[in-house]
Protein backbone atom coordinates (compact mmCIF):
# COMPACT_ATOMS: atom_id res chain seq x y z
CA UNK A 1 0.00 0.00 0.00
CA UNK A 2 1.13 3.53 -0.77
CA UNK A 3 -0.20 6.58 1.10
CA UNK A 4 0.41 10.04 -0.31
CA UNK A 5 -0.37 13.33 1.43
CA UNK A 6 -0.17 16.60 -0.51
CA UNK A 7 -0.79 20.02 1.06
CA UNK A 8 -0.82 23.37 -0.77
CA UNK A 9 -2.44 26.79 -0.58
CA UNK A 10 -4.16 28.36 -3.57
CA UNK A 11 -4.97 32.02 -4.09
CA UNK A 12 -8.28 33.12 -2.60
CA UNK A 13 -9.87 33.79 -6.03
CA UNK A 14 -8.94 30.31 -7.30
CA UNK A 15 -10.01 28.28 -4.25
CA UNK A 16 -13.65 27.86 -5.37
CA UNK A 17 -12.65 26.66 -8.86
CA UNK A 18 -10.15 24.27 -7.31
CA UNK A 19 -12.99 22.74 -5.29
CA UNK A 20 -15.04 22.30 -8.49
CA UNK A 21 -12.11 20.59 -10.22
CA UNK A 22 -11.56 18.32 -7.22
CA UNK A 23 -15.24 17.36 -7.23
CA UNK A 24 -14.97 16.45 -10.93
CA UNK A 25 -12.11 14.09 -10.10
CA UNK A 26 -14.08 12.56 -7.24
CA UNK A 27 -17.14 12.07 -9.45
CA UNK A 28 -15.03 10.25 -12.04
CA UNK A 29 -13.46 8.05 -9.37
CA UNK A 30 -16.88 7.22 -7.92
CA UNK A 31 -18.19 6.27 -11.37
CA UNK A 32 -15.17 4.08 -12.11
CA UNK A 33 -15.43 2.45 -8.66
CA UNK A 34 -11.74 1.57 -8.47
CA UNK A 35 -11.29 -0.68 -5.43
CA UNK A 36 -7.56 0.09 -5.10
CA UNK A 37 -7.98 3.87 -4.74
CA UNK A 38 -9.22 5.66 -1.63
CA UNK A 39 -8.86 9.41 -2.16
CA UNK A 40 -10.03 12.29 0.02
CA UNK A 41 -9.43 16.03 -0.02
CA UNK A 42 -10.03 18.39 2.89
CA UNK A 43 -10.22 22.17 2.86
CA UNK A 44 -8.59 23.87 5.84
CA UNK A 45 -10.25 26.61 7.90
CA UNK A 46 -8.54 29.38 5.91
CA UNK A 47 -10.63 28.39 2.87
CA UNK A 48 -7.66 28.12 0.53
CA UNK A 49 -5.37 25.40 1.89
CA UNK A 50 -6.10 21.90 0.60
CA UNK A 51 -4.91 18.57 2.00
CA UNK A 52 -5.12 15.57 -0.32
CA UNK A 53 -4.81 12.11 1.18
CA UNK A 54 -4.63 9.19 -1.25
CA UNK A 55 -4.37 5.51 -0.40
CA UNK A 56 -3.30 3.27 -3.27
CA UNK A 57 -3.22 -0.51 -3.14
CA UNK A 58 -0.52 -0.54 -5.84
CA UNK A 59 1.55 1.67 -8.12
CA UNK A 60 -0.85 0.71 -10.91
CA UNK A 61 -3.72 2.22 -8.92
CA UNK A 62 -1.77 5.45 -8.53
CA UNK A 63 -1.13 5.45 -12.27
CA UNK A 64 -4.88 5.13 -12.92
CA UNK A 65 -5.52 8.30 -10.91
CA UNK A 66 -2.64 10.19 -12.51
CA UNK A 67 -3.91 9.33 -16.02
CA UNK A 68 -7.55 10.23 -15.34
CA UNK A 69 -8.47 13.15 -17.68
CA UNK A 70 -10.24 15.06 -14.90
CA UNK A 71 -7.18 14.67 -12.64
CA UNK A 72 -4.87 15.92 -15.38
CA UNK A 73 -7.20 18.90 -15.90
CA UNK A 74 -7.24 19.57 -12.14
CA UNK A 75 -3.42 19.56 -12.04
CA UNK A 76 -3.03 21.74 -15.15
CA UNK A 77 -5.48 24.34 -13.88
CA UNK A 78 -3.92 24.38 -10.43
CA UNK A 79 -0.42 24.93 -11.84
CA UNK A 80 -1.69 27.63 -14.23
CA UNK A 81 -3.37 29.60 -11.45
CA UNK A 82 -0.41 29.61 -9.10
CA UNK A 83 -0.02 28.96 -5.42
CA UNK A 84 0.40 31.04 -2.32
CA UNK A 85 2.24 28.03 -0.90
CA UNK A 86 3.41 25.34 -3.36
CA UNK A 87 2.54 21.67 -2.88
CA UNK A 88 4.42 19.60 -0.33
CA UNK A 89 4.15 15.85 -0.86
CA UNK A 90 4.79 13.33 1.87
CA UNK A 91 4.67 9.53 1.81
CA UNK A 92 3.03 8.11 4.93
CA UNK A 93 2.88 4.77 6.70
CA UNK A 94 -0.43 3.58 8.13
CA UNK A 95 -0.30 3.19 11.90
CA UNK A 96 -3.95 2.13 12.36
CA UNK A 97 -7.46 2.52 11.01
CA UNK A 98 -11.02 2.09 12.32
CA UNK A 99 -12.31 0.72 8.98
CA UNK A 100 -11.01 -1.09 5.94
CA UNK A 101 -9.40 1.30 3.47
CA UNK A 102 -10.12 -0.76 0.37
CA UNK A 103 -13.48 -2.32 -0.52
CA UNK A 104 -12.31 -5.93 -0.84
CA UNK A 105 -11.12 -5.80 2.77
CA UNK A 106 -14.62 -5.09 4.11
Locate each region found by the language model.
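Mid-chain, well-packed structural core segment of small domains
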Residues: 73-76
